[in-house]
A protein has these predicted regions:
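Active-site residues of response regulator receiver
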Residues: 8, 52, 82
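The feature encodes the CheY-like receiver
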Residues: 14, 56, 86
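Charged docking surfaces used in two-component/phosphorelay signaling
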Residues: 15-23
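Alpha4 helix (beta4-alpha4-beta5 surface) of REC/receiver domains from two-component response regulators
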Residues: 18, 62, 84-102, 112
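Short hydrophobic/Thr-rich beta-strand motif most characteristic of the beta2 strand and flanking loop
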Residues: 25-32, 40
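Acidic catalytic/metal-coordinating carboxylates
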Residues: 33-36, 59-62
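Active-site beta3 strand of CheY-like receiver
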Residues: 44-50, 55
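The C-terminal output helix
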Residues: 115-126
């Protein structure tokens, strides 16, 4: 069963995502800030990370940069989620994230993108 790490400081938003993405048949782990996200990613090695940009303690851009330098997480698909706009999108691509979704999220499109990325990872693992 694929594992998705959801990183956001809004617990209601995390619950909504878990509910709406339940049909994907994935296990979810959560982190409420950047430091927790790094710890969870290193220990549990999720198959995909949904990462908010505005987080307490360590922002999502910094988390992504650190994860991309770690051998165990450098190829893990990362999807940024944020209410921030296009300038952030450009920086996201430069940081090697796999995608960027503006809040409020288009959940159908997000589900499709998650499925694509997990399928890609499965094929690359073979």
């Amino acid at each position: 069963m694929p594992c998705i790490l959801i990183v956001d400081d809004e617990s209601d938003f995390i619950e909504l995502l878990q509910y709406r993405l339940a049909g994907l048949g994935c296990e979810f782990i959560v982190a409420g800030n950047g430091v927790q996200a790094l710890s969870q990613a290193r220990q549990l090695k999720p198959d995909l990370i949904l990462l908010d940009i505005l987080l307490p303690d360590l922002d999502g851009l910094s988390v992504c940069e650190i994860l991309r330098r770690q051998p165990s997480t450098k190829k893990t698909p990362i999807i940024f989620m944020s209410a921030l706009s296009s300038e952030v999108t450009k920086r996201t691509v430069a940081m090697q994230a796999d995608d960027f979704f503006t809040k409020p999220l288009d959940l159908e499109r997000l589900q499709l993108r998650i499925t694509e990325l997990l399928h890609r990872e499965l094929l690359m693992a073979k």
